[in-house]
Amino acid sequence: DNYTGDFYITAQTNDKDLILRCDDGSGGVTAYLTLDGSVGYTTVQKRIRFNDNVFLGVGTGNDFTIDHDGSHTSLQNSTGNLSIKNYADDGDIIFQSDDGSGGIVTYFELDGSVTNIKVYKDIVFADNIDAHFGTGGDLRIYHDGTDSRFQEFTGNLNIINYADNKDIIFQSDDGSGGVETYFFLDGSTGHTQFPDAKKLQF
């Protein structure tokens, strides 16, 4: 106990450590915390548990904090950018969450070996939220709650099928609640085909 002023624990020997040890739960003794005097950093050898609503603050002004309130966990940054980086060669950044059945599944990952983003679950855009493609957002896809639109603001809008002998097929409602083909671009013959009994009105 200390009742006046600060309380110091000091190791004066050059390049030596200050080691906090305790029982290891099996009748022995082990290090829990080491202040390493030879390299100038602190090594934590055992888990640290923060109780609910006690945050871990990083930075002189606690600019980055991690906390858990008993129900939810928050990572909060209040100064500058918040960057997530993986410097491991060919390593990935993987985002996982509950799979709806009590398990864990990958939703998407940043693949460092092939430098692309892999998406394993649906992406849902709310009504009136555009998906933009191109540096200037020149191609946009959106749904307004009633209708869907593809919009191109620069250059041509091309629909291309590179598969040998395959088609581009245009389908729509058949007037009876089903879907049928109205016409298709036949990749095996090079013709535009209109199925039987389809009227072409001008």
Regions found by a protein language model. Give the residues of each.
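Self-maturation zones of extracellular/virion spikes and adhesins
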Residues: D1-Y32, G37-F202
